[in-house]
């Protein structure tokens, strides 16, 4: 009992669990402890076992009273009384090893005992709990699969809608194709013409601006030279003032010369100022040219905006394509998730099978280990001569337990022999019954042959 893989319930717990899991209605209400103590009732156990088989395997009630189709029996009506017990044992013999009970026998149906039946019912209830948890997990997996399928359907619908939108954006209606082509051609021509005009005017303005810059630089150089000449003349004048001669004639002549040079310088200065004013007017004309340039720039900006609009439309189409690709990737992910869920279920089934195999193997190992330990204990007990009083009492208890086990084995053998004798007696009775039937059939066939012979003779005589 130490190697059981399920808890051992008492009678009260068994009654509660059976009412909750197996028996419902009046059967569950009528169930009580007296049905299991002191000796369990076979009728109640039949009903519990049948309900468990109906719940797990889906076996209907009429299946217990039907002869299997793969068995040929000459007189099936003779087995009607034993057939429900035989079919119940057949189903329970395959069901109890699943509940981790490997010693279920037909005696447990015909003559049940309290300890064994409580262990069997504990195993059945534990398996039903395990089955319910597995069904809940399976339902969760099915709900997840259903939700993923619904999501995949939604994404496929969104994918199709996006494809339709993309086709609408890419395709131009037949009525507007010519206008669209003309519009695109006009835009390209205008863009080309504006670019050429803008380039020509910008080149001309740049050339004029460069010329004006060069002229202004030349004039400024000339002014600087004139200023330098004035400074040099002032220096010469100062020098000459220091060297003035007292003769008035020379002074007059020198003054006349100086006046002439001053007039020349003034006339040159006026010419330079006039040219400076002209260049200043030309520089003032530059803003109007700049306004024209700004207009051309605005036109080019409008063209750039149109280009940006076209690029935005292209970007939207690309975004739709990206969305379609992302939707397709999500569809692939959902498919991979579905495949992974299927793989998880298969892996869990394999793990369950391996766990069952390991548990069976552990039980066998524990049995072998117990046998080895018992043999070792016997050897140690034989080797030790002087033992304490406690050890002797323990040995006596062990001997008592062994004798009880031996008695149980003897009773088990006796019951097996009794069942075998009953089976042999039933078999011999059936054989005798078959022989009697065969004899009666032979006698009747002989009598029929005699009667037919007599009738034939009478017919011949009549003829």
Curated annotation (Swiss-Prot):
One Pfam assignment? Nuf2
Q: Does the keyword Acetylation apply?
A: yes
Q: Which InterPro entries does the UniProt record give?
A: Kinetochore_Nuf2_N (IPR005549), Nuf2_N_sf (IPR038275)
Where do the segments described as Interaction with the N-terminus of NDC80 lie?
1-385
Name the Gene Ontology molecular function terms of this record. Answer: microtubule binding
Q: Which residues carry this modification: N-acetylmethionine?
A: 1
Oligomeric state and interaction partners are given as: Component of the NDC80 complex, which consists of NDC80/HEC1, CDCA1, SPBC24 and SPBC25. The NDC80 complex is formed by two subcomplexes composed of NDC80/HEC1-CDCA1 and SPBC24-SPBC25. Each subcomplex is formed by parallel interactions through the coiled-coil domains of individual subunits. Formation of a tetrameric complex is mediated by interactions between the C-terminal regions of both subunits of the NDC80/HEC1-CDCA1 subcomplex and the N-terminal regions of both subunits of the SPBC24-SPBC25 complex.
Q: Which family does the entry's similarity section mention?
A: Belongs to the NUF2 family.
Protein name as catalogued: Kinetochore protein Nuf2
Species of origin reads: Mus musculus
| Taxonomic lineage from the root | Eukaryota, Metazoa, Chordata, Craniata, Vertebrata
In the UniProt record, the gene name given for this protein reads Nuf2
């Amino acid at each position: 009992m130490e190697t059981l893989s399920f808890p051992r319930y008492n009678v009260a717990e068994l009654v509660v669990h059976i009412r909750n899991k197996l028996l419902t209605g009046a059967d569950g209400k009528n169930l009580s402890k007296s049905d299991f103590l002191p000796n369990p009732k076979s009728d109640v156990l039949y009903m519990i076992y049948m309900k468990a088989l109906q719940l797990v395997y889906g076996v209907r009630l009429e299946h217990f009273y039907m002869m299997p189709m793969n068995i040929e029996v000459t007189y099936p009506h003779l087995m009607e009384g034993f057939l429900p017990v035989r079919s119940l044992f057949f189903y329970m013999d395959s069901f109890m090893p699943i509940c981790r009970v490997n010693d279920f026998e037909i005696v447990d149906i015909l003559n049940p005992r309290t300890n064994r039946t409580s262990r069997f019912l504990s195993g059945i209830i534990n398996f039903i709990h395990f089955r319910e948890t597995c069904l809940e997990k399976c339902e969760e997996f099915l709900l997840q699969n259903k939700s993923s399928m619904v999501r995949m359907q939604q994404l496929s619908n969104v994918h199709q809608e996006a494809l339709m939108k993309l086709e609408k954006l890419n395709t131009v209606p037949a009525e507007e194709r010519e206008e669209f082509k003309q519009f695109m051609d006009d835009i390209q021509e205008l863009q080309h013409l504006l670019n050429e005009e803008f380039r020509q005017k910008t080149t001309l303005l740049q050339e004029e601006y460069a010329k004006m810059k060069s002229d202004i630089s030349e004039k400024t150089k000339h002014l600087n030279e004139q200023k330098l000449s004035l400074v040099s003349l002032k220096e010469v004048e100062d020098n000459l003032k220091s060297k003035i001669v007292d003769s008035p004639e020379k002074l007059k002549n020198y003054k006349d010369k100086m006046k002439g040079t001053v007039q020349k310088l003034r006339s040159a200065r006026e010419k330079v100022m006039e040219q400076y004013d002209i260049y200043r007017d030309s520089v003032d004309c530059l803003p109007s040219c700049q306004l024209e340039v700004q207009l051309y720039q605005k036109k080019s900006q409008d063209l750039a905006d149109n280009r940006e609009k076209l690029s935005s439309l292209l970007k939207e189409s690309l975004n739709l394509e990206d969305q379609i690709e992302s939707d397709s990737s999500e569809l692939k992910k959902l498919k991979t998730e579905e495949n992974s869920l299927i793989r998880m279920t298969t892996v869990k089934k394999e793990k369950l099978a391996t766990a069952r195999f390991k548990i069976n193997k552990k039980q066998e190992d524990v049995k072998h280990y117990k046998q080895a330990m018992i043999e070792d204990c016997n050897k140690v007990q034989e080797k030790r001569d002087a033992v304490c009083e406690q050890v002797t009492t323990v040995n006596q208890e062990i001997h008592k337990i062994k004798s009880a086990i031996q008695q149980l084995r003897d009773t088990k053998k006796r019951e097996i022999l009794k069942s075998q004798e009953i089976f042999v007696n039933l078999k011999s009775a059936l054989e005798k019954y078959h022989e009697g039937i065969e004899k009666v059939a032979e006698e009747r066939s002989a009598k029929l042959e005699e009667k037919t012979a007599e009738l034939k003779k009478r017919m011949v005589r009549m003829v």
